[in-house]
Regions:
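Blade-edge beta-strand/turn elements of extracellular beta-propeller
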Residues: 2-10
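Serine-hydrolase catalytic core recognition
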Residues: 9, 16-173
Length: 173
């Protein structure tokens, strides 16, 4: 229930906030899998005052690292949006065909789709550099953050529930 709640940080990204003792200001650290972290000082109305720090990842880019890409596809029901992340080889050529490796975790509570920026991605970048496209898809049933029906989709079928969504997602890419 969000009635009466006003979001302070509305930028697209995963946010971590820490209010200062006075509660007049807070530090908002946010990023996305495809966007480096921003560390901002904001007032208690959400207005940005100062960028406090900016990470320097130039060496990673020079070494051939590429940001993964976010995507949205439909679930096997052809109604529900599924969010995913894709890692491509550094020398990706859109005219070529690549084998796909899909990271699937049919476990409870949270899936394996990263939402924050990281250079350590459970070997997805390394597999991409071997010539694969690697994807991670947020299957129905993997998170309670999208409501009870979405979260309980795999109830009683922990092993197989994400496979239909995963197959359908790959077919759409």
């Amino acid at each position: 229930d969000r009635e009466g709640v006003t979001p302070l940080s509305t930028e697209d990204g995963q946010h971590q906030v820490k209010f200062l003792k006075s509660n007049r200001y807070y530090i908002d650290t946010y990023s996305r899998v495809d966007m480096e972290p921003k560390i901002m000082l904001k007032d208690n109305k959400g207005q940005g005052i100062l960028e406090l720090a900016k990470p320097d990842i130039e060496l990673a880019y020079k070494a051939g690292w590429k940001k993964p890409e976010r995507f949205v596809v439909k679930a096997a029901d052809n109604i529900t949006d599924l969010h995913g992340v894709m890692w491509k080889p550094a020398d990706f050529d859109s005219t070529k065909v690549y084998p796909i490796i899909s990271v699937v975790y049919p476990g409870p509570y949270f899936g394996q789709v990263p939402t924050s920026f990281t250079l350590e991605d459970r070997c997805c970048t390394r597999l991409a550099q071997l010539g694969f496209i690697v994807i991670a898809v947020s299957h129905r049933g993997d998170t309670p953050m999208r409501g009870k029906a979405y979260h309980r989709f795999g109830y009683g079928n922990m092993r197989d529930y994400p496979l239909a969504d995963d197959k359908y997602a790959i077919e759409q890419l």
